[in-house]
Amino acid sequence: MKTDVIINRDALCALRELPDESVHCCVTSPPYYALRDYGLDAQIGREDTPEQYIDRLVAVFHELKRVLRPDGTFWLNIADTYCGTGSKGGYTDPKNPKGRNGQSLSLNRRAPNCKQKDLIGIPWLLAFALRADGWYLRSDIIWQKENPMPESCKDRPSRCYEHIFLLAKSKQYFYDAAAIAEPIAPTTAARYRQGRAAGHKYAEEVPGQGKVQGINKARKGGYYDDALIPTMRNRRDIWLINTVPYKGGHFAAFPPKLAETCILAGCPKGGIVIDPFFGSGTTGKAAKDLDRHYIGIEINIEYCALARARIGGEST
């Protein structure tokens, strides 16, 4: 199987041609529902109902599950959509701030069982559908942005986050927690030095106290040896990562740091990362920069050209 390649095809058709259990990790962000018209007959995101949109994505990711190794992980970036009037409203696709230019279809679709102005709940509808299809739903990571697109709404808070779902094919899967660990807070280190325990004011002689979160070995005479105080902690599930500008013609690119974090945790060095909605190639570039291989699938030939210019690689 070729790697470091960009495949110009529909995601489902291209995945069907890949061998079983051949890739280590998937990092992807499919087109969001009813927010942009890419002008392609087979595009995902322009379905008449949210249910049809969910069904199409589940079919794509069902095929992805076959292609993933048993220890593979799937990192899915998705955002929500508001139910509208069926006309072109004022809501902007968070991945496509300039995506309204030249639109030919309504961008705010009506949805069955939803009232006008309802938040449809696309991320969780998709997550539950994938879980029902056999995926292990392991984490809902909040991607928080300090520089979100401004919104003109006056009757709700402006949105500043998207979801990243971590899913796995099996109960046991590759996850390198150390690769994305984050520094402990200075106040936490200070508490360790003072001998304070989690949930207690002091570490010494607290009735019923056992080990202080597994680090009692570091304590000497009621205090902690600096050399043994932990400096890192497990990555939390709120990731503060700002969007970054991209000079190419594809406005849906998510930040490289986002893709890099997922790849570091979910794919071993030398492994293969796949993105069935490759766009301008952010996932592929991140994989290449981190000494992993990539397979990109993209239906839009113009985006394939952007990705090839950005990261190199073979196109088919």
PLM feature spans:
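Core catalytic lobe of class I
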Residues: 1-316
